[in-house]
């Protein structure tokens, strides 16, 4: 379900013996009310009798899974020896992304940008002492300078273009994780036309 305020998604699966789903939302304006922007929970049920066997909070699991997926993909597809990542969009997921990239890919520098400077300040503070150089940037263009990996994780649903074609050189690995529903585009179409795309 998509609305002007956010998105609610159900992610079901079954192997014939058990049925499970994850419920997750994304509502960027929740912070104005002191609420998390993302919450998730999951249910696992016995297919034979329909009874639930597990109900679990999955907000942290969602953050970990998303970051781990990005890092595993970057390990396989990013240029060998990549050690600098640009992180465009500095909400809570950005910290998980950075730590996963450090652990799995071996990055030693992250360049941060968010349209909300307070988000960048918070992300940088939370990453302090993690053994990674953190550079706060004033623009997306500045953030991607020298980065071999670019991760976008933005919440804009107004067809915003976060990265334009002239910003991204050849050989850059992009994890566009914020473009997950209608209206959340992040990348200029020209980038997609000249890129190898993996979903």
Q: What is each of the regions a protein language model found here?
A:
Residues 104-128:
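NAD(P)-binding Rossmann-fold cofactor-contacting core
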Residues 167-172, 176-199:
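Rossmann-fold NAD(P)-binding glycine/threonine-rich loop
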Residues 1-63, 69-71, 78-81:
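N-terminal ligand-binding/catalytic initiation module
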Residues 77-84, 106, 169-170:
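Short helix-loop-beta connector
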Residues 94-95:
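N-terminal Rossmann-fold NAD(P) dinucleotide-binding loop
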Residues 89-91:
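Glycine-rich Rossmann-fold phosphate-binding loop(s) that bind the pyrophosphate
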Residues 148, 154-156, 178-179:
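Short glycine-/small-residue-rich Rossmann-like dinucleotide-binding loops
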């Amino acid at each position: 379900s998509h609305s002007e305020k956010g998105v609610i998604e159900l992610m079901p699966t079954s192997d014939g013996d058990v049925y499970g789903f994850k419920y997750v939302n994304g509502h960027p304006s929740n912070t104005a009310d002191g609420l998390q922007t993302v919450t998730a929970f999951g249910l696992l049920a016995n297919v034979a009798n329909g009874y639930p066997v597990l109900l679990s909070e999955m907000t942290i699991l969602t953050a970990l899974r998303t970051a781990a997926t990005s890092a595993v993909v970057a390990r396989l597809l990013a240029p060998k020896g990549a050690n600098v990542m640009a992180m465009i969009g500095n909400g809570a997921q950005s910290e998980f992304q950075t730590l996963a990239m450090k652990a799995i890919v071996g990055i030693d520098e992250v360049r941060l940008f968010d349209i909300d400077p307070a988000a960048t300040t918070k992300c940088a503070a939370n990453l302090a002492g993690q053994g990674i150089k953190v550079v706060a940037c004033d623009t997306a263009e500045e953030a991607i300078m020298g980065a071999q990996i670019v991760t976008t994780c933005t919440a804009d649903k107004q067809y915003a273009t976060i990265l334009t074609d002239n910003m991204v050189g050849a050989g850059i690995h992009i994890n566009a994780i914020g473009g997950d529903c209608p209206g959340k585009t992040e990348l200029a179409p020209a980038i997609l036309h000249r890129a190898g795309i993996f979903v």
